[in-house]
Amino acid sequence: MRGSLCLALAASILHVSLQGEFQRKLYKDLVKNYNPLERPVANDSLPLTVYFSLSLLQIMDVDEKNQVLTTNIWLQMTWTDHYLQWNASEYPGVKTVRFPDGQIWKPDILLYNSADERFDATFHTNVLVNSSGHCQYLPPGIFKSSCYIDVRWFPFDVQQCKLKFGSWSYGGWSLDLQMQEADISGYIPNGEWDLVGVLGKRSEKFYECCKEPYPDVTFTVSIRRRTLYYGLNLLIPCVLISALALLVFLLPADSGEKISLGITVLLSLTVFMLLVAEIMPATSDSVPLIAQYFASTMIIVGLSVVVTVIVLQYHHHDPDGGKMPKWTRVVLLNWCAWFLRMKRPGEDKVRPACQHNERRCSLASVEMSAVAGPPATNGNLLYIGFRGLDTMHCAPTPDSGVVCGRVACSPTHDEHLLHAGQPSEGDPDLAKILEEVRYIAHRFRCQDESEAVCSEWKFAACVVDRLCLMAFSVFTILCTIGILMSAPNFVEAVSKDFA
């Protein structure tokens, strides 16, 4: 038993020592007279075929401002080295050998659109070679490539970033670069971007320096932005802020906060606009979709502030500034009020105006009744005058627009009546009393007329507020739906990211 174990152990040791000896001998035979600068082909007039592919492991970063894509990629290059072939029977147990960087020939394939400071960002690994001379080179690397970022549909955008690989010094007559499909089976998902696909294309390009074509392999990485983050942090707050701007038209003009609310909303949108500008590239090729929405919302809010100033001007209009123009009264108080189904306060409770031919204001009757009375009633003359004024009704003028007949009494007609009924010169007390009555009546008439003018302007301000509320609401809804849904993949982004 012990003898058999000893024999087995000795055989295994002898086998290992023999295998190590064969491998050492193979390395010595292969590198003997081998020149890493020589292209390993049997016929120098024929090109060496190199098969190229890549494995995309991770999208690490997409820098929109600097337009740089950072990816974790494993390159895959295979070719046949004519000088690295051996007979497997002469070297039993040695199936593959590995050569470090610089010891054998390798294709100088680089990323053409590299944005890395070192340009070549690969980690140079060993080259795996089998007995038939088949070489396999798998260098990993963190690649930074320049990528044109089209922010037109941000944040519902899909980017197409290209990775162009090719030999830096070998032309198509010396090195035939062939493409193989990219491998994304080991891809690690990214929190900001979804990988749509990786498509490869081989092409040949002629440069002015050389007559021979230079083949290259271009892999197009298609990625779609995940919009949940931007929707919660930019879009939804903007929609809410634009909705708050509509509250400007619901605030009463006497509150004194209409302008403050409009300016506050405008400043809030400006802050969000600055946040978008910080992450977007400084390009004039296209305006981002979210910037278009912010700009339209800012225009709406800015116009609401302007309209609010007009509303406040109407509401606090000075009666001494004149009556409302006829066209303004027709447009606002008639057409717009009818369209908005608005009625003036107290419009249904109008005192009936007097008829021109039947009952007119007559201060003379008051005066004559006071004069015809006995002397004992002189102490109640002021009371009689007030009673007469209180029961007076006058017809409105056609251009006044005031429905209360008492307000629109013609001062010239009343003064004529008062002067027509002047008392005799022998009664100075009655003359003074009637003079005071005329003054009080004139003050009441002016006060009522001013209140009527103010009421007209205030009602016009309410009509403008209601009209702008409806118009701005419709415009805001149309802008929100029209701009955001114009993105080609809006429905796909909402269904995948917000579901």
Curated annotation (Swiss-Prot):
It is found in: Postsynaptic cell membrane; Cell membrane. Residues 313-466 are cytoplasmic. Residues 20-230 are extracellular. Residues 257-264 are annotated as: Essential for TMEM35A/NACHO-mediated proper subunit assembly and trafficking to cell membrane. Glycans are attached at residues 43, 87, 130. Glycosylations at Asn-43, Asn-87 and Asn-130 are essential for TMEM35A/NACHO-mediated proper subunit assembly and trafficking to the cell membrane. Keywords: Calcium, Cell membrane, Disulfide bond, Glycoprotein, Ion channel, Ion transport, Ligand-gated ion channel, Membrane, Metal-binding, Postsynaptic cell membrane, Receptor, Signal, Synapse, Transmembrane, Transmembrane helix, Transport. It comes from the Eukaryota. GO terms for cellular component: acetylcholine-gated channel complex; dendrite; neuron projection; plasma membrane; postsynaptic membrane; synapse. Component of neuronal acetylcholine receptors (nAChRs) that function as pentameric, ligand-gated cation channels with high calcium permeability among other activities. nAChRs are excitatory neurotrasnmitter receptors formed by a collection of nAChR subunits known to mediate synaptic transmission in the nervous system and the neuromuscular junction. Each nAchR subunit confers differential attributes to channel properties, including activation, deactivation and desensitization kinetics, pH sensitivity, cation permeability, and binding to allosteric modulators. PANTHER family: NEUROTRANSMITTER GATED ION CHANNEL (PTHR18945). Homopentamer. Homooligomer of the short form gives rise to unfunctional channels, as does coexpression of both long and short forms of the receptor. Can also form heteropentamers with CHRNB2, mainly found in basal forebrain cholinergic neurons. Interacts with RIC3; which is required for proper folding and assembly. Interacts with LYPD6. Interacts with CANX. This is Neuronal acetylcholine receptor subunit alpha-7. The gene is CHRNA7.
